[in-house]
Amino acid sequence: MKKRYGIIGCGMMGQEHLRNINLIDDALTYAVYEPNPNMRKMAKLLAPEAKFHDSLDKIVSDENIDCWLIVSPNHLHMDQLEQVARVPHKPILVEKPLFTNINHLERVEKFLVKYTAPVWVAMEYRYMP
């Protein structure tokens, strides 16, 4: 059975993730939330079979998602992580940075203590010679 990805955000980095998921035999982009009409249109070209949700609440409540990719604008990551944490915990890959406001450090610490599934922060371009 293919792993069903839920994608939050499909700008430039989100579209790169969609392309990469398409290359994995046992994975599929199952659901997408992208509020920007232009980015949503691009995402539909890359993942035409995906369900496109019109709100964060709707995608988060989709019980068929096996894992999450949070690829939204940086300042939204913390709020979206907390929203995803309200439903059964599934693995999450969140693009860097994890948070943009030092005052959110305590929120991150609380999230990581309570969240029972793996959480990764993407850093694939940390070193490019």
Descriptions of predicted regions:
Residues 127-129:
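Oxidoreductase and adenylate-handling cofactor-binding alpha/beta cores
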Residues 42-50, 107-112:
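Short, conserved SAM-binding/catalytic segment
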Residues 30, 64-66:
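Conserved acidic residues
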Residues 1-47:
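N-terminal Rossmann-like dinucleotide-binding module
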Residues 51-64:
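Short acidic low-complexity segments
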Residues 66-70, 78-124:
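Beta-strand-loop-alpha-helix segment that lines the small-molecule cofactor/substrate pocket
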Residues 73:
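Aromatic "clamp/platform" in nucleotide-sugar-dependent glycosyltransferases that forms part
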